[in-house]
Amino acid sequence: LLEGRENLGGTWDLFKYPGVRSDSDMHTLGYRFKPWIHDKSIADGPSILDYLNETVDENKLREHILLNHKVNSANWNSEQSHWELVVKNDEQLINMTCNFLFLCGGYFSYSKPHMPSFKNYENFKGQIIHPQFWNDQIDYENKKIIVIGSGATAITLVPAIAKKANHVVMLQRSPSYVISRPSEDAVNKFLRKFLPVKVTYFLIRWKNILWQSYTFFLARRFPDKIKKSILDLLKDELGHDYDIEKHFTPSYKPWDQRMCLVPDSDLF
């Protein structure tokens, strides 16, 4: 296994911003063979990183992993019937070959994320921070903060920084669908009182997979009804005098894009 970074964990090791968490339940996001045993199924980043490292150690995978080995190129050699890789380790280039190649590198750059530009960017006197490069030295207590965007990262970040900041505004170009659900699975907590961990995990995993598949089917089959249901839930959260149409009504149908998950209504 070749890992370009100095640590395992990918997103869960890299992202340090306040509130970093999963936006899927860990019974479906987790491995089939390793039960998720924590109470919260919508889990924080450090807990997920611990889970990944436990999995690596329990299966004795660490000895097979090369850290700081970034794949620069991979080409198929038809004559030799194998893959030819050029791998960078520090400043050294290493040639490797393999018969089978699995690419699990994600879809964005860890070192060069998209950084939007805007007018008078250079004249702004405050800090401009990309969440991907958040570190423990950033002090946002009692600060006035604008978060640009309303996707999964913003939905996660805003409730966390609002606890210490003076004032937080989420600035969006267009709304996203936002759905609230409990961070703890009540059925899971109930079944764990009577059933073995592995049995409970299996049942909850399939309960969630089937439920999510069913709701996805309904959203594609009856988009207008599902949209109304989502907006009605938001009205219950924010009050019927809140401008849901302006701030939380996307121009697209439910599940045309991934929905944003809000555990325990923390955004509201």
Residue ranges: model-predicted function:
Residues L1-I65, Q172-R173, E237-Y242:
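Beta1-alpha1 glycine-rich phosphate/pyrophosphate-binding loop at the start
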Residues L1-N7, C104-D243:
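Rossmann-like dinucleotide-binding core of oxidoreductases
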Residues D13-S24, M115-E122, Q137-I138, L267-F268:
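FAD-binding beta-loop-beta segment adjacent to the flavin cofactor pocket
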Residues G19-R32, K225-T249, C260-D266:
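Flavin (FAD/FMN) cofactor-binding and adjacent substrate-gating region
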Residues G30-I37, W211-S213, F248-Y252:
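Short glycine/proline-rich turn/loop motifs
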Residues W36-E54, L66, I148, L218-K228, ...:
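Short beta-strand to alpha-helix junction loop
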Residues K40-S109, I230, E237:
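Feature captures the FAD/FMN-dependent oxidoreductase FAD-binding
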